[in-house]
Regions:
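Short acidic/histidine-centered micro-motifs embedded in hydrophobic/aromatic stretches
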Residues: 103, 124, 159-162, 195, ...
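C-terminal accessory subdomain/extension
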Residues: 314-346
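Acidic/His-rich, divalent-metal-binding segments that scaffold phosphate/diphosphate chemistry
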Residues: 58-190, 203-206, 211
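Membrane-cytosol interface segments
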Residues: 1-99, 328-333, 338-340
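Divalent-cation-assisted or electrostatically stabilized phosphate/pyrophosphate-binding catalytic cores
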Residues: 42, 180-198, 222-325
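A residue-level detector for short acidic-glycine micro-motifs
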Residues: 33-35, 167, 313-315
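Short catalytic-site patches enriched in acidic/histidine residues
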Residues: 168, 173, 216-231
Length: 346
């Protein structure tokens, strides 16, 4: 199964999952041969892409080759970012924007779909939990949010740079606190919180974009005033900092830590749904949750009742999409199920 943009669909392809309009209307059932009329209909209903059947063995082989290239590039990029950080911290030299973001943008551009991006990052982040890897992930995810928001290339590059440098202040936090394998004490958390101010102070020594400095300072601020270091509310938080905040929280929650496993993406979405409206930029958070959930359409998941299913449709309750059970192809609308939800993406 693979995702194909509607403008790249060809007659004769076969749908892998049911195709729904953005409003939930069934347009074409799965296992149907796509006609020219169907393609025109998809365009009429503003359907951007559909999932079509393909050779699973061939797809797996192609993805494995692609992933191997991305994995090697990712590792090299982390090494390069480490050198850039050393330049900034110890040599008082900061690379130009294009040099800094080159690796991040190149990795981003290798992904054809958002599912590929999240699937690859989910695997890569399990092998590297360093601040450098987190910064690379935030840069990539934040750029995707910018693309979804329709921002121009100049603004996307600003976002990529802000993501890479947002946590630079952590290098001034003692390792025994930063890497502590357990819950921080109140006093230790107060020390951790200082990394935002430290980051701004470090970057303020250089002639770089103000948005990069502000993202380092404000990426833990929340729209309702519950964040730090200043307890700012919406009117004092710029868009780039708000985007970095969402990407930062998502990557942190889905990443493995020494004291816990990474959370299932749909559990993270549920957490965002619970208090996201008040804490995060309303322009980006709803779009982000819908797009992330939609990225997993066609994916196989494990439900909390132990059964395996395939996601076929995202409802207004993004954390609880509609699925078909693999055992009998019956449809289960998770938003109507109180005791069943997605436990893991397989």
């Amino acid at each position: 199964m693979r995702e194909i943009k509607v403008n790249e669909l060809k007659e004769g392809m076969t749908t892998a999952v049911d195709v729904f309009s953005p409003k939930g209307q069934l347009i074409l059932k799965r296992h149907q041969t796509v006609s020219a009329f169907d393609i025109a209909k998809f365009g009429f209903y503003n359907i951007a892409s559909v999932y079509v059947e393909g050779s699973s063995a061939q797809e797996k082989e192609e993805w494995n080759k692609k992933y191997a290239i991305i994995k090697e590039k990712y590792r090299d990029s982390i090494d390069n970012l480490h050198e850039y950080m050393n330049d900034i911290l110890y040599r008082n030299i900061i690379p130009d924007k294009n040099t800094l973001i080159r690796d991040s943008v190149e990795i981003f551009d290798r992904f054809e779909t958002s599912y590929e991006l999240f699937d690859a990052l989910q695997v890569l982040k399990q092998t590297d939990v360093s601040t450098m890897a987190h910064s690379m992930n935030v840069s990539i995810i934040a750029r995707l949010i910018g693309v979804w928001a329709g921002l121009d290339t100049e603004k996307l590059d600003e976002i990529s740079m802000a993501g890479l440098l947002h946590d630079i202040g952590k290098f001034k936090i003692p390792d025994e606190i930063l890497l502590k394998p357990g819950k921080l004490t109140k006093e230790e958390f107060e020390v951790i919180k200082k990394h935002t101010v430290y980051g701004y102070e470090i970057l303020n020594n250089f002639k770089i974009l103000e948005s990069t400095k502000r993202a380092a300072l404000l990426h833990h601020e929340k729209f309702d005033g519950s964040g730090y270091p200043f307890g700012y509310t919406a009117d004092k938080i710029d868009d780039i900092s708000a985007i970095i905040t969402i990407a930062d929280v998502y990557d942190a929650m889905t990443s493995k830590r020494c004291y816990r496993d990474g959370m299932c993406p749909f559990d993270v979405i549920e957490d965002f749904e619970y208090d996201g409206i008040s804490k995060y930029h309303p322009k980006y958070i709803g779009m982000f949750l819908k797009k992330i959930a939609s990225s997993y359409i066609g994916s196989t998941v494990l439900l909390t009742n132990g059964k395996k299913a395939k996601i076929i449709f995202v409802t207004e309750k993004y954390s609880r999409p509609t699925v078909t059970l693999l055992e009998d192809n019956s449809v289960l609308v998770l938003k109507d199920e109180k005791d069943i939800k997605i436990a893991a993406v397989l």
